[in-house]
Regions:
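Short, amphipathic alpha-helical segments
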Residues: 68-71, 75, 107-111, 115, ...
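Short polybasic/polar patches that bind polyanions
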Residues: 41, 56, 122, 179, ...
Length: 220
């Protein structure tokens, strides 16, 4: 499960769509926009916009980031997920991973389990996206790539081939090199010779890639 507005919704869970709302963070030395809802986007608010510019727009609710509250909200969501599986991985601020295979029989199958979890999050007011996958990284990247869909949400190795390399755990310098090489998607990257990949990007990047596709176990 991925929570695209986690920072903002840790302070206001049930956002009113018609009310522009932004969350600012001064971690870079000055207050900058970290997250905003769709109404604020429609007014021209963008990530990393200075607070002074947001204030000039007027009519926007402005909230300051609170890491203590975020920690409490993350802990609460992890505890909630524990109702459905004993295997839950903390991926906040992005979200969480839940190993559901062992819980399917108890909840009547995957569709019913995912629906129950989705209904719970809807009741709590969270905006979220989700995906299932054969590997943890498949599910994680799938949830980031998708908006909330129906329960037919399995993210496959074939689909991951279309994902931009910018969504994988490459460093900025590595992304720049891939761009120069004409590599845009993970499918493009997969076609490159493994020996050359290890030399250019290191064994860690190659190992993560193998875990993504299930070629190597992922001990999360």
């Amino acid at each position: 499960f991925n929570f695209p507005l986690f920072f903002l919704q840790s302070l206001i869970k049930k956002l009113i769509p018609s009310n522009p709302c932004v969350l600012v963070d001064d971690g870079k030395g000055e207050p900058l926009v970290l997250q905003m809802n769709d109404s604020a986007k429609a007014l021209g608010v963008r990530k990393d916009m200075p607070l002074a510019l947001v204030e000039r727009l007027g009519g926007i609710t402005i909230l300051e980031r609170n890491k203590e509250i975020e920690k409490k909200e993350a802990d609460s969501l992890l505890l909630w997920a524990g109702k459905f599986s004993p295997l839950v991985v903390d991926k906040f601020p992005d979200g969480l991973l839940v190993e559901v295979k062992g819980s399917l029989k108890l909840f009547g199958g995957q569709e019913k389990l995912i629906k129950k979890m989705s209904d719970d999050l809807d009741d709590l007011g969270y905006k979220f996206a989700f995906a299932t996958g054969a590997t943890p990284l498949l599910a994680e990247i799938g949830a980031k790539k998708r908006r909330k869909e129906d329960v037919s949400n399995r993210f496959t190795s074939k689909e991951i081939n279309t994902v931009p390399v910018s969504m994988f755990s490459f460093l900025p310098k590595q992304l720049e090199l891939l761009k120069k090489m004409g590599v845009r998607t993970l499918g493009d990257y997969k076609k490159l010779p493994r020996k050359g990949l290890a030399e250019r990007f290191g064994k860690d990047a190659l190992q993560q890639f193998d875990r993504l596709y299930g070629y190597e176990p992922d001990p999360q």
